[in-house]
Amino acid sequence: MDEASRQSPSYSETETLNLGYDVRDQLKIEIVKNVDVQPKFKSIFLNKGNRFTFKILHGSGHFSVSINNTDLADKLYIDGERVITIVPKKEGPIEIRVEDVEIPDSIVSISDLLISDVGRLEIDTPGTLIESGSHMEINVTAFDILGNQFDDDQYKLMNFNIEIEIT
């Protein structure tokens, strides 16, 4: 007999301990995936009216949420909810950390956010010449300071003033 079996006796389903009373208990097991924050990366345009919401997936529902630089943005989070709203204040990178406080040794989920002004614009036209007095559709693509293309949802706050010089 090994040492572990000597220390804690085991009983089969048919054996009893003869305690003089029944021992009954219940155990509820709930399997929960580790918390996850989506998206893992987002670049947002620096504008005081801009807000971006991260989604918290899985986990117990009770989280500790933090950002690594409150000078760059404000974090809006209500305990028990599954969304984190970020309001930018200054340009720069932020790390958003979400830890499940109900699950011991759970993995911390991290998302990165870049708050950026437009670093570069690309203008695409179907042709190179336009006749005087006519019009042409152009496509403008904006990139952040690290060269990432802004997602479509960020263009609503950008005011492009494109001037054309006719020679």
Across the structure, where does each feature detected by a protein language model lie?
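Extracytoplasmic soluble-region selector
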Residues: 1-167
